[in-house]
């Protein structure tokens, strides 16, 4: 049961989403035997959010050398997640080693860079936090298939600019809002340490 304060905080998110996550999904996801899959899926979603922000910067805002630096920054996270290479503890200290140079031809490049870099840092921090929670609960990382939710939304992205960029940003907003809504509703069903996260 959600507190009245949390219900009030979620109200704008519910209005944006237009429909709530079904109770059947919540009761299934909240079962302790599904905790490993829930955390692994969340881990992958954090990385995909960082990758999406990186794609937007690379596609619309930065020069080639900056794009290469972004790829190198995310590579260890991708290697761990998709190829199961490396030790997750080594991911803690990784950061971007280069300033991002905006494309001269873009009026919004610097603003997009600034906002998306903050988002990438936040998502990679959350990625590492999920790994810590998994370690605390003796949950080993194993590859699982990606959720179909984002793929379903992205099918509706228009193929011409600037509408394609706008559509991708809107899809990202829906994905983030749904994640927020689901975890707020799941929190009372999860162990305290995970609920606090």
Q: What are these language model-derived features?
A:
Residues 1-197:
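Non-heme di-metal
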């Amino acid at each position: 049961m959600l507190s009245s304060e949390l219900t009030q905080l979620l109200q704008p998110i519910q209005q944006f989403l237009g429909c709530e996550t079904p109770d059947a999904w919540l009761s299934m996801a909240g079962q302790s035997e599904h905790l490993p899959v829930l955390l692994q899926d969340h881990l992958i979603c954090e990385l995909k959010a960082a990758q999406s922000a990186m794609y937007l910067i690379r596609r619309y805002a930065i020069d080639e050398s900056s794009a290469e630096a972004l790829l190198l920054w995310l590579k260890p996270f991708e290697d761990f997640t998709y190829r199961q290479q490396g030790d997750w503890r080594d991911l803690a200290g990784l950061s971007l080693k280069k300033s991002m140079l905006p494309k001269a031809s873009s009026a919004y490049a610097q603003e997009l860079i600034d906002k998306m870099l903050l988002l990438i840092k936040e998502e990679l921090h959350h990625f590492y936090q999920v790994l810590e929670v998994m370690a605390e609960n003796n949950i080993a990382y194993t590859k699982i298939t990606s959720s179909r939710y984002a793929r379903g939304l992205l099918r509706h992205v228009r193929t011409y600019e600037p509408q394609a960029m706008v559509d991708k940003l809107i899809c990202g907003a829906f994905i983030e809002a749904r994640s927020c809504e689901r975890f707020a509703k799941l929190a009372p069903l999860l162990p305290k340490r995970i609920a606090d996260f």
